[in-house]
Amino acid sequence: YKGIRITLDGLKKAKEEGFAFKMIFVGDGADKSEMEKYAKELGLEKECIFPGAIRDRELLRRYFCAADMFLFPSTFDTNGIVVREAAACGLPSVLVKGSCAAEGTTHLQNAYLIEENADSMAEAVRFSCREEEAVKNMGGAAMEELYISWEESVRRAVDRYGVVIDNYKKGNTERDRIWTDPFFAMMAEIQTRMNAAYAV
């Protein structure tokens, strides 16, 4: 559940209160035409743009850099890599409190956390329109605190595999059926060979 209806309902409330904005919904999917229709029903056809999927990374980066906030009220996504992509462009995200995507974020420091409803989303939009300097500062904090480079992601993954492999070698496992999996046995063998190569 991506929270697109909550977003649209919140935008309608903000528009009715006189706030001016543009919202770009990047992405494709089975519900895209239904969401476009719903935006029109709400009278948001001038405010909402639906360009579809964008595969050009540079174009996507430009969309991020042109925005004030990244509205991502998803309660479905488990990682929220797009939150890190937005942070890489100095863009704070609007996230649902307690969602996986909001993990590691702090309200009004590097993100804007909302309840899962249209009123809370409308308040986030109002905040974005009223508090430009605060939003900019939150974006800077998001870049500093949330962005993780691919190199760092790989380093962390390798470190985690190292722990798994060490546990396998020592027999320190609580879930033996997982650690006896051929994949982990192979990884342990590769690590042993690498350690031997570095020891020479």
Regions found by a protein language model. Name each.
Residues 107-108, 112-118, 127-132:
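Conserved acidic donor-binding segment of nucleotide-sugar-dependent glycosyltransferases
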